[in-house]
Each structure stands twice: as structure tokens, then as C-alpha cells.
Regions:
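Flexible "cap/lid" subdomain of the alpha/beta-hydrolase fold that forms the substrate-access gate
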Residues: 1-12, 16-172, 186, 192-193
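Catalytic histidine-centered segment of alpha/beta-hydrolase-like enzymes
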Residues: 175-188
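Short, hydrophobic alpha-helical segments
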Residues: 191, 195-199
Length: 199
């Protein structure tokens, strides 16, 4: 952002991108005009059952735990599940999503990269109190849209934002983790109106 000369911006954060965005926001609160949060976690309560094998890897970065993650989370079945679990109608989700994603995941050496990303995500929970303090102190205007069927980042985590953010537009949608797949038009309309109101 510094290289492109961005002085003021809104941050759209989702999944792995949420911790990156929250790090930026906490470091440069004066630059953030608003947050758009889509299934991106900042609370311990938002890391539920899905995360148990990943937490085991954080605690013990062993070959056994790495294999457990590879076998359960880096397969074509797991990638398809991320797109279809919790959705209203799996039939409307294009298979191109998981086929293309998996073709990239299966590149030589990429599995090791994904495992390292799982491991490095473990640095985030320790920063949750800092991000929550940022929310409370600076109160950035925030649009939150969240698929209630998301098993990776369950709805419970979304509701905790209400505790810290007062200027919060809050939407729980009847869809899954990749909420744009079923509700892209609705979410884009919400984003445009939010940006118009808060720019």
C-alpha cells in the first residue's frame, strides 16, 4: 500500500486475508476509512472444530500431524467441500472453482507451502486482543457479511464483532464459506452502498 501511495483506504478482508488486513489496520488506523469483513475471524470463539487438527499442528509440527492435514484438507474432495458445504444449492456452484484451485494446489512443492500457511496462521490468535482493542478504540465503519453455513469460520465468530464495533452493518446470509458464490450480487450491492455512505 505504501508503494502505490495509498493514504486512505477501505479494507475488504476474508479468510486468510482477514489477519493481514487487521494487522494493517491496527498499525495504521488513521488510514482506514472502513472495514468490509466476509467470513474473516478475529476472535477465539470463531475457531471451532474445523481448527482442531490445525491447532494440533501448531502445538506439534510433526510429520504425523502434517500428514493428517494433507490427507484431510488438501485433496480435491476437501477443496470442493469448502465451496459447497453450507450452501443453499450446491448445484449452482461451478465445479470450475475447485478444479482450478486444486490444479494449483497440486503443483510440485505447493503442499509444503500450504502446510506452512496452516502453521503460520497460528500466529494470529495471540493478536486477537490487539485487533479487538483497535476496533474498540477507533470504531471504523464496518460492513460484515457472513455465510451462516461456514464450518471453517462459523457464525459464532461473526457475532463477537458486535461486542467491539458500534458502527457495524451486520448481515448473516444463508450460504457457506465462499459467500460470493451464491450471494455475489447482494454482497456487491451492500459493498457499493457502504462505500458510498462512508467514503
Amino acid at each position: 500500500l505504501g508503494k502505490v501511495g495509498a493514504k486512505k483506504y477501505m479494507l475488504y478482508v476474508m479468510d486468510y486475508g482477514a489477519p493481514i488486513g487487521f494487522r494493517i489496520a491496527a498499525k495504521h488506523p488513521e488510514r482506514v476509512q472502513g472495514l468490509i469483513i466476509q467470513n474473516g475471524n478475529a476472535y477465539d470463539e470463531g475457531l471451532r472444530d474445523f481448527w482442531n487438527p490445525i491447532k494440533a499442528y501448531w502445538a506439534d509440527k510433526s510429520a504425523k500431524n502434517a500428514k493428517a492435514l494433507s490427507d484431510s484438507l488438501l485433496t480435491i474432495g476437501a477443496t470442493e467441500w469448502q465451496y459447497t458445504n453450507g450452501t443453499r444449492n450446491k448445484a449452482v456452484i461451478s465445479p470450475d472453482n475447485w478444479i482450478i484451485d486444486q490444479s494449483k494446489l497440486d503443483r510440485p512443492g505447493n503442499q509444503a507451502i500450504q502446510l506452512e500457511m496452516f502453521y503460520s496462521y497460528g500466529t494470529n490468535p495471540a493478536l486477537y486482543p490487539e485487533w479487538q482493542a483497535y476496533f474498540r478504540k477507533h470504531q471504523p465503519p464496518t460492513l460484515l457479511v457472513w455465510g451462516k453455513g461456514d464450518y471453517i469460520f462459523p457464525e459464532e465468530g461473526a457475532h463477537h464483532y458486535k461486542r467491539d464495533l458500534k458502527n457495524l452493518e451486520f448481515h448473516i446470509l444463508d450460504t457457506g464459506h465462499f459467500a460470493l458464490e451464491e450471494d455475489g450480487d447482494l454482497i456487491s450491492d451492500l459493498i457499493l452502498q457502504f462505500m458510498k455512505t462512508n467514503s
